[in-house]
């Protein structure tokens, strides 16, 4: 799923609502049969821990921890997590496990952030402009990882972006304008990331 809109349209706010980071003042948000707007603080914390993985534009890695340790620390709060080393290898970082963030490129740091989100084994992965700070080639690699995650592991991946070209990779596109959902479109034939140009 892609949430599309201009800067300041409300995309990140919607993402934060879906992730239980903000609370709605009106209406309901139903995910997987649960109305998360009715959750108390403990339920929201449990929801964020168990059901949601976050990938932000800026990676929020712990600078004094290695790539492996950055993923391991995230899974300490999860019951049904995946093996951190296996996940890092799956995103192409098997030879960078013991490197600190300062020793990694921007694309490698973003892959650590994605591995951290994947390793929690959440139902929902929320990505806020995951390619915004990356070059074209690295951005496509990151999007491919996310698309494969959705297709192969049956996870709901939500990508927030202002890049209209990315709508072609999604099965559902939500367009946001001035803090409101302008439209919800279904794409019966999403393209693979390799076919998309911007």
Question: PLM features: what roles do these ranges have?
Answer:
Residues 1-176:
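ABC family nucleotide-binding domain
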Residues 172, 180-198:
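Conserved beta-strand-loop-alpha-helix hinge in the C-terminal portion
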